[in-house]
């Protein structure tokens, strides 16, 4: 989720470059899955109108507007886009038993930022225990972090000073083994603190 950052205005050059990028990805990867994020939607209360609609016509790209459970390589996976209400999220999670959750999630106890060296904790309604035994790979929070079964993959590059000291890159998950590989982004600019 959050392929785009601005929910109300995206420049034409940006639109064209993103379409070209996903067409390129589509030629390389047979299966590209995107969960709708809160910055991809027009209305805060609905995933119906989204900037991601422009990508749904590209081969091999699948966009999740609503939560869906699928079996992939023998593993039960929940694809969970942005849900505006913690109560709806809890209700959904109570009704599923899955191996993996992939989504745009706001989970209590997760660190929101490294800004100014102060750790900000989100005290939301959904907790790591609500996911039972599932391994959770989540977006929404920009910094990479692991807390038991919760894995925020973070942004692939630094966006602001709050990313200082946090590794950026891409996480690759092998569903058959459950093992991950992190490839650090050593190309993009980084925010650093100078003493």
Language model features with spans:
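Catalytic phosphate/metal-binding cores of nucleic-acid and nucleotide-processing enzymes, i.e., regions
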Residues: 8, 16-28, 32-34, 90, ...
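Binuclear metal-dependent hydrolase catalytic cores centered on His/Asp/Glu-rich metal-binding motifs
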Residues: 72-126
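Divalent metal-coordination and catalytic microenvironments
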Residues: 2, 18, 37, 77, ...
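Short, well-ordered alpha-helix to beta-strand connector turns
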Residues: 29, 74, 96-98, 132-134, ...
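Hydrophobic/aromatic beta-strand patches that form the interior of the parallel beta-sheet core
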Residues: 33, 64, 78, 100, ...
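Conserved beta-sheet core of the metallophosphoesterase superfamily
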Residues: 113-183
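Active-site environment of divalent metal-dependent phosphoester hydrolases
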Residues: 5-8, 33-46, 70-71, 84-87, ...
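Core catalytic region of metal-dependent phosphoesterases/phosphodiesterases
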Residues: 1-69, 127-133
């Amino acid at each position: 989720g959050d392929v785009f950052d601005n929910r109300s205005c995206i420049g034409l050059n940006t639109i064209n470059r993103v379409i070209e990028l996903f067409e390129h990805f589509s030629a390389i990867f047979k299966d590209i899955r995107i969960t709708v994020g809160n910055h991809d939607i027009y209305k805060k209360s609905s995933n119906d109108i989204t900037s991601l609609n422009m990508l749904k016509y590209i081969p091999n790209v699948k966009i999740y507007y609503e939560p869906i459970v699928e079996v992939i390589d023998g593993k039960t996976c929940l694809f969970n886009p942005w849900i505006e209400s913690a109560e709806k999220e809890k209700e959904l999670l109570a009704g599923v038993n899955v191996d993996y959750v992939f989504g745009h999630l706001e989970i209590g106890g997760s660190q929101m930022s490294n800004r100014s060296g102060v750790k900000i904790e989100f005290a939301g309604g959904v907790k790591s225990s609500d996911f039972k035994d599932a391994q959770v790979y989540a977006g929404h929070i920009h910094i990479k972090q692991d807390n038991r079964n919760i894995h925020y993959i973070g942004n692939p590059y630094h966006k602001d000073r709050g990313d200082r000291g946090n590794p950026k890159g891409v996480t690759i998950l092998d569903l058959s083994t459950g093992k991950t590989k992190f490839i650090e982004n050593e190309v993009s600019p980084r925010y650093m603190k100078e003493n």
